[in-house]
Amino acid sequence: MTENSDKVPIALVGPDDVEFCSPPAYAAVTVKPSSPARLLKVGAVVLISGAVLLLLGAIGAFYFWKGSDNHIYNVHYTMSINGKLQDGSMEIDAGNNLETFKMGSGAEEAVEVNDFQNGITGIRFAGGEKCYIKAQVKARIPEVGTMTKQSISSELEGKIMPVKYEENSLIWVAGDQPVKDNSFLSSKVLELCGDLPIFWLKPTYPKEIQRERRELVRKIVTTTTTRRLRSGPQGTPAPGRPNNGTRPSVQEDAEPFNPDNPYHQQEGESMTFDPRLDHEGICCIECRRSYTHCQKICEPLGGYHPWPYNYQGCRSACRVIMPCSWWVARILGMV
């Protein structure tokens, strides 16, 4: 069976029909250049925005400076140590409850940080291989106002501070082993010490002073014993006095020896806290004017302890002590 199919002839396309087969042509678009006025407007907006940001930053910095100005204050002074003039500075940071004292410069610089918040004092000497800490009473430093700063400046600036350096005063000797756990130290003390090993300072007195103190304690004990013997036997107390059952003994009230407490009484010594300072360690009770108080920081000699000198390599760390009358009147704002 034969299938018949109709053949459709292909139409010939002439030259006139080429434009119908060609792809559509894209019309040319003319880009209109930006006008100068538009560019000026954009530039003006950018400049105004930058000026506003700068103004806001300046205002913020001003208020930040004004706020921190009441918490931190620096003052510079001059001190005479062994006939040699040295520069010193004191920084009061009431916001962080810190005092920082610097003495000397270069290889003779000594820095002392009093952390009243945690009750720790850190001391470091330039070129030294150790950093030292000692116990410090906890206190609160009030804010320093503008009038107070002017008063401090008039009290210290441009004057040579007298130095009190008593030969019979206590001497601070470093411990034999460094502190293993320094987590109790503040960031300021850790920043002061850096990578140096930290050693506790233990107070000691010259042997002559210790001998005098032992003699005084021996006399007190002898006098107390004599009075007890005169009061009669223990079973028959004198009239008006309680018996031993109600009267506490001295040994019962005495605290046990604590080798980690640098302020503990040892060998009949009194408390090592400087009696010229008040209980907060900020000012001087008996002083009528400011002075520079220096203390000796020494290294252990490692020899026989009863030897007259069991320390070596002493260096001095000095700080300014203000009269308590001035401190209370000015710092606390009572006048």
Curated annotation (Swiss-Prot):
Transmembrane portions of the chain: 45-65
Please provide the Gene Ontology terms (biological process) for this protein.
cartilage development; cell differentiation; negative regulation of angiogenesis; negative regulation of endothelial cell proliferation
Q: In which tissues is it expressed?
A: Nasal and articular cartilage, and fetal epiphysis.
Attached carbohydrates are found at 223, 236, 244
Disulfide-bond pairs as recorded = 131-193, 283-287, 284-324, 294-318, 298-314
Q: Which InterPro entries match?
A: BRICHOS_dom, Chondromodulin/Tenomodulin
Keywords, A to Z? Chondrogenesis, Cleavage on pair of basic residues, Developmental protein, Differentiation, Disulfide bond, Extracellular matrix, Glycoprotein, Membrane, Secreted, Transmembrane, Transmembrane helix
- Supply the residue numbers of the propeptide(s) excised during maturation: 211-214
One Pfam family named in its UniProt record: BRICHOS
Q: Which positions carry the signal peptide feature in this UniProt record? A: none
**What PTMs does it carry?**
After cleavage, the post-translationally modified ChM-I is secreted as a glycoprotein.
UniProt cross-references to PANTHER family, sorted A to Z: CHONDROMODULIN-RELATED (PTHR14064), LEUKOCYTE CELL-DERIVED CHEMOTAXIN 1 (PTHR14064:SF6)
Give the similarity note: Belongs to the chondromodulin-1 family.
| Full protein name | Leukocyte cell-derived chemotaxin 1
Organism annotation: Bos taurus (Bovine)
